[in-house]
Amino acid sequence: MLPAFSSCLKGVFIFCLLHFCSLNSFAQKDPDYISSFNDRPHLTFELASRKQDVVIRNPDAENIQLTYRPNSRSNFIACIDYRWLSLSLGLIKFQSSDGDRKGETKQFSFRASFNGRRFWNSNFIQIFNGYYLSNPQVANPSFNPQSDFYPYRPDLTTTTFFSNVFYCFNPDKFSYRASLYQLDRQERSAGSVIAGVSLRMHRMLSDTGKTLIPNELESQFKPEYRLISQSASNFSFNVGYVHTFVYKHSWFLTLYFVPGISIQNSYYLSEDKQIRNLQNKATAVSEFRFILGYNGDNWYSGISSYSISFAGKRDLGVWVDDNYSWFRMFVGYRFKAVDRTNLPDWRKKIQL
């Protein structure tokens, strides 16, 4: 394990403390704006497409840019939501039809969220094994994308962990839980400024120790820029705005934009076998999400798109941008409310 991951454990400790904010953050709501389905267990099924682009730039020649991405078509996901707890697990991966030319990618994903009205916290881990170079024309101008085989790295694995805590400034009229987890329903259009902190821990490893720079371009990159593996952590401060537009009671559109400043610590292993430590570098981060859906009394469904980007910088030496995007279609059902009169004491204490 590269050193950056062990140094990030202190950040995980901070977030473990913040998780408990959500257990005691059920602010009062205005019933004209928010209806709650808090005591009804939710079961949701998703068909999701996830991408994670690793963009490698040459600090000495910005026109040289290599983009590696997983060849993952879609993933079938099951989600359980009840009161403040939300869990999801990727169950089935559907193979891509072009796997013979771009290679196959294995993937795993798991999410755990703690959802109050004023505070919410989300934690997510995803793993991809197997990447292909999506723009091989940079190294081979004669490449034919219709018939040629893409350069494929079955040895390349990325592991990414996200965690965030956000605060809602208008919890009595706006519910983030309504659009994302359908634990509530937004009855009237409303929005809120939100602010929070987030943590990303990212590791990219190559089992073979081979550089990600194609042979044709090695002369364009200094040895210290010929990336083999990377470990990075980002602690970000975010402020933005989210708004839900309601149409005819049950139809909704949610737009979410949250930019921020990120403090990045990175370790890079290059072809010269030196590990370089780049600490406390300020970079930009931005998040965008839209959700369009239907939220009825029992059934709900919709589509959503989410993207987050961590921009690299020239002065970091090895210039790497990490771009994440998710698209999902979902449908879910609410079961009858749980009788809480005979719950064990431990569940009453944690309000679950």
Model-identified regions with their sequence ranges:
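Short loop/turn motifs that connect adjacent beta-strands in outer-membrane beta-barrel proteins
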Residues: 28-39, 170-191, 206, 247-253, ...
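Outer-envelope beta-barrel architecture signal
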Residues: 37-43, 74, 83-85, 108, ...
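Membrane-embedded beta-strand positions of outer-membrane beta-barrel proteins
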Residues: 43-47, 78, 87-89, 112, ...
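Transmembrane beta-strands of outer-membrane beta-barrel pores
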Residues: 47-53, 82-86, 91-97, 116-118, ...
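Surface-exposed strand-loop-strand hairpins of Gram-negative outer-membrane beta-barrel proteins
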Residues: 51-75, 86-103
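Outer-membrane beta-barrel "beta-signal"
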Residues: 162-165, 323-352
